[in-house]
UniProtKB/Swiss-Prot annotation:
Gene Ontology, cellular component aspect: cytoplasm
This protein's record includes keyword Cytoplasm: yes
GN (gene name): efp
Organism lineage: Bacteria, Pseudomonadati, Pseudomonadota, Gammaproteobacteria, Enterobacterales
Annotated keywords: Cytoplasm, Elongation factor, Hydroxylation, Protein biosynthesis
Location in or out of the cell: Cytoplasm
Protein name: Elongation factor P
Pfam families: EFP, EFP_N, Elong-fact-P_C
Amino acid sequence: MRVYHSNNFRSGRKIIFEKEPCLIESSEFVKPGKGQSFVRVKLRKLLTKQLIEKTFKSTDSLEIADVSEYTLSYLYNDGHFWYFINNNFEELSVDKKIVGVNKKWLSEQDTCVITFWNNQAISITPNIFVELKVIDTEIALKSDTINTTTKLATLSTGAILKVPLFIQIGSLIKVDTRSGEYVSRIK
C-alpha cells in the first residue's frame, strides 16, 4: 500500500479518504507558534463531487488512490449506456448515471476524459469548449432588442441555452461546458 504523508499533500494528488477516492484541491501547511504543525486540506470526493475541508496532523498519512484518467472518443448511446473508443480501438461502455448532465455536451467523435477507479468509470469530463449546431431557435425581430438581447436555442445534443439574437437555425456555436454558456459563433 502506497501512502502520501501529510507534508506531501499537494494540489491535484488523489488519495483515499473515508474509503472513497478524493482529489486534493488545496493544501496549506501551518506551523503554529505553540503546538504541533498541521496541514489544512480541501478535498473533492470524486464519486459525489462533495467538497470537504479537513485538518491532518503532520504525522498522518493517507493511501494513494489508484485513479486513472483516459482520453476517449464518444461513439454513440443506446439510452442506458454511452459507448466510447480508445486509441487501440477498444470499445468501452459507461452507465448513463455516470455521464449525467455531461450528455448535453457530447456529440459523436468528440473527445472527453473519463476517470476510472478500481476499473470502473466514476466520472466524465467533456472538453472545456465544444462546437455544436443550433437546431431550433426563435426568430428575432428588430423590436426585440428593446427588452432583451438573448433568446433560447436548442442545440444538436438537446441542450438549451441563451444565445445572442443574431444566431440562426443551422449556426455553429462555441459553448463553455463548465458554465453552459454561449462563447462565440463559428464561421
